[in-house]
């Protein structure tokens, strides 16, 4: 009984060993047609890691040949299915450059952007990848405005912009929190210009107003009046945009104190 159990345990290990040995021999083989057939078979059986390795191995040999486009496409797709989005995105972009007349060009361009979307980090980290993804999606929408992918592209852009909105708002608020009021003012001003759709525009505009006031009131005397006048302008914009704001009482207090400071400077 014990020997039967040992056989049952050893059998799959042997099969795995044979399978691995066969795969390793295939990788080192010069039979490229067999490699190509095996790569397609692995891909169709969802063995994407092995498929990707074989397709990569075939790329140089088939360059400029009949199957080059297919290999480039399935190599990129294998990496994508393996969730290696960084390398997959690079390969989709490379495919688009190498095969500009391919029937798969639209899909390759979409996946190039989508891989950057999938690789985009949390909002509190560096957002270079996020910005690149937005740029690629916008280029895709401009080139294929009637693509069936457009709704998905727009959804992805909206999600990516939400990350940028949150990050830039927290940067601006961080300056306000540490009392760097000039930097806070400029950051909130840029935020409002860049993100007209932001849900925290009211908060941003109020903190910009308060930063404007605190920067002005602590300025040198020869600069103060001009900066106080800017506070008045900022209040007018805030009051016009959010006349029923939860910050209205505080904003009106800032306006009153600003007018008083300006009047005192004229005495």
Model-identified regions with their sequence ranges:
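Acidic, polar-rich low-complexity tracts and alpha-helical solenoid repeat scaffolds
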Residues: 2-7, 19-267
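Bacterial N-terminal signal peptides
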Residues: 9-17
């Amino acid at each position: 009984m014990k020997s039967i159990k040992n056989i049952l345990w050893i059998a799959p290990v042997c099969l795995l060993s044979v399978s691995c040995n066969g795969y390793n021999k295939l990788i080192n083989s010069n039979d490229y047609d067999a490699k190509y057939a095996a790569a397609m078979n692995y891909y169709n059986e969802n063995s994407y890691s092995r498929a990707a390795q074989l397709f990569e191995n075939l790329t140089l040999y088939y360059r400029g040949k009949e199957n080059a486009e297919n290999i480039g496409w399935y190599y990129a797709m294998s990496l994508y299915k393996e969730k290696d989005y960084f390398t997959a995105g690079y390969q989709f972009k490379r495919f688009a450059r190498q095969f500009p007349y391919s029937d798969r060009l639209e899909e390759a361009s979409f996946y190039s952007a989508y891989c950057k979307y999938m690789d985009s980090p949390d909002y509190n980290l560096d957002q270079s990848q996020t910005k690149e993804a937005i740029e690629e999606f916008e280029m895709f929408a401009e080139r294929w405005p009637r693509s069936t992918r457009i709704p998905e592209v727009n959804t992805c852009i909206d999600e990516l912009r939400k990350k940028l909105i949150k990050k830039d708002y927290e940067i601006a608020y961080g300056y306000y929190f540490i009392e760097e009021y000039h930097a806070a003012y400029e950051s909130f001003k840029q935020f409002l210009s860049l993100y007209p759709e932001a849900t925290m525009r009211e908060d941003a505009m109020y903190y910009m107003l308060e930063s404007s006031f605190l920067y002005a009131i602590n300025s040198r005397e020869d600069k103060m009046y001009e900066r106080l006048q800017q506070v008045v302008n900022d209040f007018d914009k805030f009051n016009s945009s959010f006349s029923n704001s939860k910050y209205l009482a505080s904003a009106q207090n800032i306006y009153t104190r600003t007018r008083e400071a300006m009047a005192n400077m004229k005495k």
